[in-house]
Regions:
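All-alpha prenyltransferase/terpene-synthase fold signal
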Residues: 1-239
């Protein structure tokens, strides 16, 4: 994904494609995918099937993002489906593998899978806010990356749905990739002072609350407490 968006920084370090080039980055991803498939084969058909279906969702989500919402479809609804497929699916699968290999009851495995999906979505929505609100030395990546690529995010979609005439110029700037660096900085300042940032944070907290509620069927334990704490860590992070 770093290669896809041509990001120079990820989590405070050089991205693989910047450090080693596109070819090595792609081949490394292929190797890791092959290695994980080999390891999962030892866990049986169900584990392999879960990986395949997760990868299917990831690819479908990427296709949906590239195509954009259908005519008449709510762009925000479309975006949240993309996020669920691209990010939620990965964390859901990780959580489900934990339940499967630990021998947890089926209902417990289903519960942590649902939690994983929701916390995965929350993680991406937090990234959307961080991309706008944080400085580079806080977030470990270049602020405004999505603006430069013209990729819709929670924050920009909240701006785009505004009917306030005062937002027209900003909406125009957000309607295409922004290549001029001075304009990127101008838009970042405008977004940081826009009500869409607070609205996006509220939506992020709603998803995190849904993740906590998903844990309701589980008994109180250190493990459940750790998952609750994960919700706080995801929404409070700056990188």
């Amino acid at each position: 994904m770093t290669l896809w968006i041509e990001a120079p920084l990820r989590r405070g370090v050089e991205s693989a494609n910047i450090r080693w080039g596109n070819t090595i980055a792609i081949l490394t991803g292929d190797f890791l995918f092959a290695k994980s498939s080999d390891l999962l084969a030892d866990l049986g058909a169900e584990a392999v099937r879960l990986q395949a279906r997760t990868f299917e969702r990831l690819v479908v989500g990427q296709i949906m993002e590239v195509q954009g919402p259908a005519s008449g479809q709510d762009p925000l609804e479309h975006y949240l489906k993309v996020v669920a497929d691209k990010t939620g699916s990965l964390i859901a699968a990780s959580a489900r593998y934990g339940g499967m290999v630990s021998g947890a009851p089926a209902d417990t495995t289903d519960t942590v899978t649902l939690f994983g999906e929701k916390i995965g979505v929350a993680f991406q929505l937090a990234d959307d806010v961080i991309d706008i609100a944080s400085e580079s030395n806080q977030s470990g990546k270049t602020p405004g990356t999505d603006l430069r690529e013209g990729v819709p995010t929670l924050v920009t979609l909240n701006v785009m749905k505004s009917t306030d005439s005062a937002d027209r110029e900003l909406q125009h700037l957000l309607s295409a990739p922004i290549k001029d660096e001075a304009t990127v900085q101008q838009v970042l300042v405008a977004l940081r002072n826009h009500r869409a940032i607070d609205e996006s944070r509220d939506q992020l907290h709603q998803v995190a609350r849904a993740a906590r509620l998903a844990l309701g069927p589980l008994p109180v334990s250190d493990a459940t407490g750790a998952l609750m704490s994960l919700c706080d860590a995801v929404i409070d992070r700056s990188a």
